[in-house]
Curated annotation (Swiss-Prot):
Sample GO molecular function, one term: amino acid kinase activity
Top-level division of the source organism's lineage: Bacteria
Lineage, highest ranks first: Bacteria, Bacillati, Bacillota, Bacilli, Bacillales
Organism per entry: Halalkalibacterium halodurans (strain ATCC BAA-125 / DSM 18197 / FERM 7344 / JCM 9153 / C-125) (Bacillus halodurans)
InterPro entries, per database record: Aminoglycoside_PTrfase, Kinase-like_dom_sf, Pseudomonas-type_ThrB
One protein family per Pfam: APH
Family: Belongs to the pseudomonas-type ThrB family.
Name the record gives this protein: Uncharacterized protein BH3399
Stored SUPFAM superfamilies: Protein kinase-like (PK-like)
Length: 329
């Protein structure tokens, strides 16, 4: 989640018809069909949907204070590699300047922008999924991991690791968050003792939830690799299945997902026993990111959508804080 102050200044450019002159200005570097650019959402990134020559695409951009340009380029390198392995992964589109990422300077800030092809298929909620779809979902994640285990050495993709994430946690959590600091110390010690091998550790998607998956009959497409990082592969399984509730390998949906995963790649099943630790690691990182997001640029003049979002995020922060306090009574 980006800073709410960043969100506010960009969403303010969106009119009642969901159009934005800022988005259209950015898209001049790719081209677009007139009156086809519409705001879709803002969370970790700003997303606009549009058409060019009648074909559907998505514009993704963010303020330069939110993302690292080098890391975006490394993400796209990974996405292109997976696409070259015949996986249905949303691919970036070259701009008129032959760039995958455009740096766009505007009166309200500098933005890093990427355009992606739209994936075929439909979005499903967890409650809608049948056993076959759960299997395919797990199979797709396993296929992604299997390919990432075999990334050529000359590709050398540079992305953050779990250690980098915990360094950010340390930076963003104030020292008066006593329970969170205790949780950070405990999780750091726990993660340090986990085994690391080529088969159990590497680049993960990090956010392979159903929002980032498209089902197309018997195939699955994936998108949104912007949080990809070096973690244990099991963490990707645990994080993908958050909608299933508390992670238990005996839960039917989780069993089916894991069965699909194992049909595509090796799974070090002993690490599934560490699911609670991975959940707590995710909570800690999410807590820190939300604290940063709910920044101090607050005003009673905020638009209604932002006030509601701020309240929801503060509620999440309080829930995480309570869980840390319960862990360290």
């Amino acid at each position: 989640m980006m800073k709410l102050s960043t969100m506010k200044k960009v969403v303010a450019t969106v009119d009642k018809k969901w159009r934005s002159p800022l988005a259209e200005f950015i898209l001049e570097r790719w081209g677009f069909d007139r009156h086809s650019v519409f705001y879709w959402r803002a969370s970790a990134n700003f997303i606009f949907m549009f058409q060019h020559h009648g074909k559907k695409y998505y514009l993704r951009f963010n303020d330069s204070c939110e993302r690292n340009l080098t890391l975006i380029k490394e993400e796209l390198k990974l996405v292109q590699y997976l696409g070259s392995q015949a996986l249905a992964i949303a691919q970036p589109v070259l701009s008129k300047n032959n760039n995958l990422v455009e740096v766009v300077i505007t009166p309200i800030g500098t933005f890093y922008a990427v355009v992606f092809e739209a994936l075929d298929g439909e979005h499903l909620s967890f409650e809608e999924m049948n056993e076959e779809q759960l299997f395919l979902w797990g199979e797709m994640l396993g296929t992604i991991h299997e390919n990432l285990k075999n990334v050529p050495n000359d590709l050398a993709i540079k992305r953050p690791s779990w250690k980098d994430d915990l360094e950010k946690v340390k930076e963003w959590i104030p020292s008066n968050e006593i329970a969170a600091m205790k949780e950070l110390e405990m999780i750091s010690e726990w993660a340090d003792q986990l085994p690391i091998t080529k088969e159990n550790f590497g680049i993960i998607h990090y956010d392979f939830e159903l929002d980032n998956v498209r089902f197309n009959e018997i195939t699955i497409g994936a998108l949104d690799f912007d949080d990809c990082a070096y973690y244990w592969y099991v963490a990707d399984i645990v994080y993908a299945l958050r909608d299933a509730g508390k992670f238990r390998v005996t839960t039917p949906a989780i069993k089916t997902f894991i069965k699909g995963y194992k049909s595509s790649t090796f799974l070090e099943e002993e690490l599934l026993e560490e699911a609670n630790g991975f959940e707590r690691l995710h909570h800690l990182v999410s807590f820190a990111r939300l604290l940063r997001s709910v920044d101090k640029d607050y005003s009673k003049e905020e638009p209604g959508y932002l006030m509601d979002l701020r309240k929801n995020l503060v509620s999440l922060i309080n829930n995480y804080r309570l869980s840390f306090e319960q862990n360290h009574k």
